[in-house]
Each structure stands twice: as C-alpha cells, then as structure tokens.
Amino acid sequence: MAVAGAMVMSGALLLLHLLAFTCVACNGGSELPPISRRSFPKGFIFGTSSSSYQFEGGAVLGGRGPSIWDTFTHQSPDKITDRSNGDVACDSYHLYKEDVRSMKEMGMDAYRFSISWSRILPSALSGGVNREGISYYNNLINELLSKGVQPFVTLFHWDSPQALEDKYKGFLSPNIINDYKEYAETCFKEFGDRVKHWITFNEPWTFCSMGYASGIMAPGRCSSWEVGKCRVGDSGREPYTACHHQLLAHAETVRLYKEKYQALQKGKIGIILNADWFVPLSQSKSSSDAARRALDFMLGWFMDPLIRGDYPLSMRELVGNRLPEFSKEQSGMVKGAFDFIGLNYYTSSYADNDPPSHGHNNSYNTDAHAKITGSRNGIPIGPQAASFWFHIYPEGICEMLLYVKENYGNPTIYITENGVDEVNNKTMPLEEALKDDTRIEYYHKHLLALLSAMRDGANVKGYFAWSLLDNFEWAEGYTVRFGINFVDYDDGMKRYPKNSARWFKKFLQKSNRDGNKRLKRVAYNAFSN
C-alpha cells in the first residue's frame, strides 16, 4: 500500500506540471479571440449567483430570525472593513422583481440564490415554519420561472440560525445534522415541484477556515493567537469538526432527497466547493509537494470523501487525531453523495514548502505546511484585483478543471461562481463607475480558459457569474464591488447596468449556431501551445 500511495502521489505531482503546459493564457496586449453563447455546447447554462445575506436585506422583516451573520456584524463590527452589515444589503427582499427582469433582459438562463435558513425556520423545525418566508421564496421562484429563468437553489450559504448557535454551538455539534436535514426537507416539500437543482452547502472550506480557524467571518471562533483574536475557539480542531458535520449533513440530505423526492420531483442535488489553483513556487519537489498539499487541504478536504469515502492521506497524516474519522457506514454514505459538483473559482496562488516549527500552535492555517503567496521573485502571478487576496489568473480555472477530471473521475461540474472585484470609489461619477472593462476582460479570458478545459474533456455543464449586483462582501463589507450591475447604496438601491452587463447581453444573444466550431477552435488555440 505504501508503494501504491507513492505512485499515486507521484502521478498527481506530474499532473500539476503537465497542466501548466496545457492551459496557457492569451498573451497580454493581443486582441482576444471572439466568444459567445454559440461557442458552447447546446444546453450549456449561463447564469448569475447571489446569496441571501449578501443580497436580501429585510433582516427583521417577514418573520425572519437572526442568523450568525447578523450577530457577527452587530457584535463585532470591527471585523468588517467598513463596519457595515447586511441588514439592508441590496434590498432584493423588496426589489427581486426588478432583479429578475434584469436577468431576463440580459438573456440569463438561470439564477443561483440561497435560502435564508432563519427566514424559513427561525430556530429548528420544532419552532415552526415561518410561512411569510415560504411566501417570499415562492414569489421569487415563480417570478424567475415566469421569465424563463431556472432557479438553482443553495440551502446554506454561511448564515445558520443564531438560535442553533446558542443552543448547541451550531456546526460544532452533531445535533446540527438532523436540524439541517429537517430544514432541507422543508424546502424540498415547499419548492421542489419547481426547483430542479439543489445545492446543500456553499464553500464549506470558507465557512470552516474563516469562521473557525482565522475567526474573521461568522461565527467568529478561533484560537486567541490567530488573526481574528477570538475570545473562544480552537483553530486546530474546530474547523475540522464543523466541516465534518457539514459533510455528514450533506450526505444525509442527499440520501433523503434521492430516496424520497428525486423520482417524483425529477431534480438533481450537489454541493459547491472552492477551487483556487496552486502553482508550485519553484521546480523543486518540495514546492510541488506543497502545491498538492494546498489542494488537498482546500479541495481534497471535500472531494476525497465524496469520491473515495475518506479524507486525503496528507490530511490524515498531518492533522492526526484532530481530524474526525468516518465510520464505515458514514464513509459509504458520503462517497458518491452528489449528482453534480459546483466549483467556485476566482484566483490562484503560488505554493512553497513551509517546514513545521517545533512547539508551534496547531491551526488549520498551518497544518498543510504550505506557504501561499501571490508573487514569485517580486512578480505577481497575475494582475491585482481590488481584494488583497485576489490575483487574476485565467489559466487557473482550466488547470483546476483538468485536475478534477484526472483525479476525481470527471464528475458533472457547474462553475457556480466566477468574477472579479473593483474598489468602491464613492467619489467616482456614476458614468465612470459603469466602465468596468477589466471585468469584461476577466470574464472573456476565463470563458476562453473554460472552453479550453472542456475541449480537453472537462465535464462542465454551466457557468454562473459572480455577481448579478454589487453587494455586501462579507468581511470587506461594501468596500469592493463584484456586480455586473451597479447598486447605488445612497439612492434607494437603484440598479444600473455596467458595461459588463451589456457585454453579457451581447454574449448571450441567441441566434443561429453557424461558426460554432470555428469559435471553439479559436478559443482553444488561445489557451494551448
């Protein structure tokens, strides 16, 4: 077994190097080849994404109970760059019809949004279903369908009810598994006749690493010496516990849906994972090993259990008894528990070996022994976006998709988030704020890279831009803007299409499919040797 494991690892490391030659970006300064809806296979889905806390507002309206993000932003405003919150956000709670009309006008096929758990069940099922919350989502779903837009529904996008956090510390307790399953079943019963794509969890990596290791996002738990300087938490154990319970809740819910609802409702169910790409800092084996470990600790943390029934070997070896174990029954339940995988891709980084130091504190953030950086020899991996963590690297989406294809059996994939931010410059005239040519270039290059991966066999069925609107961007508040539509937070949340929204409208125009093969070939050549 040791020899077999070494051979698998060696093959995976070789793949990291091969992918670097497969996905080569367009040279800067050259004109980008044309691309449109016609470049993609028939039936390929295009849409935009959002989440309840970032978009809805209506925090105390319609019977909604507080979520952990309400508590976090109000009790720890210093952890939000501009000390803001999502009490109003984009006010999609009131303006959803306008937003759906915008999607229709752009020609979007689908809209991925999340349901606020605390708007449906302010506590647990025993506390009763909030019918006003059910009505809001019924209205949204019906409005989407009336305009020909498919709903892709995320059940959990980081905003669990504060009542469950108070009752048993939320995802740190196995009690959350049944409460989550009851919440999901409520949604299947109420909306499943019209919703054909369900997502159980969005980015468990972000929720667990930022919420329980760094402490910079809700519920704001970490060891006292970590960056979040939290009052309570254990950065070496709690991230693994919380995500273990999310995986089990996911698997239980998928089993429930498949056994009880899928045949009748004819929908599909999956999960969304982060998909940053990591490039070895140097040609050394230690850098390649570090890049693989970084992938294991981000993507493999979830893909390995979903495909193989257990955590990656690197995690089991490095984390030891701080990493929960699956029972035989749990392993069998988690393995294969999906119809599709959603991947959110934004950026890539370099990875280098970071040797352990004696007597260091245990933390998820250092367990991979990988030093992550955005530059090599002072040269960034790609242009800097507005956020400090964000470098633009289109090749990464291609490399990640081919890595998933080769390592995880080429599952059905949707790119469920992809986009870039700009600084929210409050002094900039509106006319100038709508000129987001960098975003257009970002989408153009990433869609070309996506086509390249599909040309090489990646099983991708759809693409969702982040995001429809500027919105509350978690720890960064309203200091950055990700939207293809501008939101004027100071003037009634008025929406204005940016140039990127107009670009998407042109990109999505439905016409005859002549030239499809030519466009595919041009796009492929732009990202290959």
From Swiss-Prot:
Disulfide bonds join C222-C230. Glycans are attached at N361, N425. GO terms for molecular function: beta-D-fucosidase activity; beta-galactosidase activity; beta-glucosidase activity. Residues 1-25 form the signal peptide. PROSITE patterns: GLYCOSYL_HYDROL_F1_2. Pfam families: Glyco_hydro_1. The active site is at E203 (proton donor), E417 (nucleophile). A beta-D-glucoside binds at Q54, H157, N202, E203, Y346, E417, W466, E473, W474, F482. It comes from the Eukaryota. Its EC number is 3.2.1.21. It catalyses: Hydrolysis of terminal, non-reducing beta-D-glucosyl residues with release of beta-D-glucose. Transmembrane segments: none annotated. One of its GO terms (biological process) is carbohydrate metabolic process. Keywords: Disulfide bond, Glycoprotein, Glycosidase, Hydrolase, Signal. InterPro entries: Glyco_hydro_1, Glyco_hydro_1_N_CS, Glycoside_hydrolase_SF. Gene3D superfamilies: Glycosidases. Belongs to the glycosyl hydrolase 1 family. This is Beta-glucosidase 11. It comes from Oryza sativa subsp. japonica.
